[in-house]
């Protein structure tokens, strides 16, 4: 397994170009299944999860081409409606083929998902919604099997806000017979980006960006061209890295307006942030102030930024409380941060972070995608050398992170698994 070695103590300066959003790219790739005509995408990040999704689509008979952030999909000859365990186990977002397959082909067989080890993320909301639209669903031998002659429009009220659930039901509804209303829908920008692609393919969707989506089903969708929204979590991660390590960095290809929950807290910590339409400049030359926060659904503070901001808080002046309301078991980075000298205690859904004056490099292990990013941030600040093991987690969600950090002055290098 590859490892990262970080020599801490370097200030960061320069420019970073932010990649397309992982959490938009994955559902958008799956949406290619909804049309027999080609879909052309731009600003697709080069990530392990994207490669896994393309492999999955390829096994179903979708012709895929990808190079330099551009991906073309041709689903005119889909001949396999099964998403196998071997691929789905590595990436939970594979469940997103379920809605498109049932909507366009009338059946699907999708393995129950895997992905990040951060607690139970049940697919029952996906299943209930599809059943409300007339799908017959059985779960046996580790697979979800769904059938429907044609899905029927329905009013769906999800029991909880679910991003992938909203996306799956939205993709199913665009080809259903009649009107579908999704209440308590996720409002994340990545859901809105998927909806924008679907509209450009001929779907009829109202309420994009709100918690109530109204979809008028159409008989078929056509091809389209679409540019994936910038990754707000990647941008937020780099903002926290500069805030923790110190320096002066400009981020390009960002949407500041979808990052406000994070930038508000960074300003509270003493960070200077300037913004334009598609850029942000972050400057920090002092010890951060401790900032408490609570994760919640968009537009509140994102759970996917909790670990990175906690890494910043480890070095802050004062004590902060971090409350995680979305996922249980999402404090696995705490014991690794403590190995670097942090002072964090956990009580249920709350972490109490007592800021320390310095961290010291050590060997640590990444446990999930965002936890690995928090260890990178801590390593940038720690005295001496930090070695992060199991960084395949990082590769699932960050496009060339170490080369982007190196370009702004960090001392980061990758040790290949066969050299470690």
Curated annotation (Swiss-Prot):
Q: Where along this sequence does the record place binding of UDP-N-acetyl-alpha-D-glucosamine?
A: 92, 121-125, 304, 326
UniProt xrefs under Pfam families: EPSP_synthase
Under the heading Gene3D superfamilies, the entry gives: Enolpyruvate transferase domain (3.65.10.10)
Q: For this UniProt record, give its keywords in alphabetical order, as a comma-separated list.
A: Cell cycle, Cell division, Cell shape, Cell wall biogenesis/degradation, Cytoplasm, Peptidoglycan synthesis, Pyruvate, Transferase
Pathway named in the protein's UniProt entry? Cell wall biogenesis; peptidoglycan biosynthesis
Q: Name one GO cellular component term.
A: cytoplasm
Identify residues that carry 2-(S-cysteinyl)pyruvic acid O-phosphothioketal.
Answer: 116
- What functional role does this protein have? Cell wall formation. Adds enolpyruvyl to UDP-N-acetylglucosamine.
Q: What is this protein called?
A: UDP-N-acetylglucosamine 1-carboxyvinyltransferase
What gene name is listed for this protein?
murA
């Amino acid at each position: 397994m590859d490892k990262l070695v970080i020599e801490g103590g370097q200030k960061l300066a320069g420019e970073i170009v932010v990649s397309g959003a992982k959490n938009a790219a994955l559902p958008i790739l799956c949406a290619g299944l909804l049309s027999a005509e080609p879909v052309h995408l731009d600003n697709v990040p080069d990530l392990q999860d994207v490669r896994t999704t393309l492999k999955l689509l390829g096994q179903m008979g979708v012709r895929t081409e990808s190079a330099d952030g551009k991906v073309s999909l041709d689903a005119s000859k889909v001949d396999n409606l099964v998403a196998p365990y071997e691929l789905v186990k590595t990436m939970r977002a594979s469940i997103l083929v379920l809605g498109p397959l049932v909507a366009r082909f009338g059946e699907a067989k999708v393995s129950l998902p895997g992905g990040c080890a951060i607690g139970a993320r049940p697919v029952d909301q996906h299943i209930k919604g599809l059943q409300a639209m007339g799908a017959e669903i059985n779960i046996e031998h580790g697979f979800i099997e769904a059938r429907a002659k044609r899905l029927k429009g329905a009013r769906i009220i999800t029991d909880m806000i679910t991003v992938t659930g909203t996306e799956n039901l939205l993709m199913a509804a665009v080809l259903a017979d009649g009107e579908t209303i999704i209440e308590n829908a996720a409002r994340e920008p990545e859901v809105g980006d998927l909806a924008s692609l679907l509209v450009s393919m001929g779907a009829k969707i109202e309420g994009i960006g709100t918690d109530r989506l109204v979809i008028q089903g159409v008989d078929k969708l056509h091809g389209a061209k679409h540019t994936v929204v910038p990754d707000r979590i990647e941008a937020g991660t780099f903002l926290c890295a500069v805030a923790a390590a110190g320096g002066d960095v400009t981020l390009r290809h960002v949407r500041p307006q979808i990052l406000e929950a994070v930038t508000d807290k960074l300003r509270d910590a003493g960070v200077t942030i300037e913004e334009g339409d598609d850029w942000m400049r972050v400057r920090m030359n002092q010890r951060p102030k401790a900032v408490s926060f609570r994760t919640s659904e968009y537009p509140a503070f994102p759970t996917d930024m909790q670990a990175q901001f906690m890494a910043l808080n480890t070095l802050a002046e004062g004590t902060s409380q971090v409350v995680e309301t979305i996922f249980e078991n999402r404090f696995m980075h705490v014991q690794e941060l403590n190995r670097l000298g942090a002072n964090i205690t956990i009580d249920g859904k709350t972490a109490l972070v007592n800021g320390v004056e310095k961290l010291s490099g050590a060997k640590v292990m990444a446990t999930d995608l965002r936890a690995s990013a928090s260890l990178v941030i801590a390593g940038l600040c720690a005295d001496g050398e930090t070695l992060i093991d199991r960084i395949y987690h990082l590769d699932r969600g960050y496009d060339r992170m170490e080369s982007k950090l190196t370009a702004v002055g960090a001392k980061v290098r990758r040790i290949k698994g066969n050299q470690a």
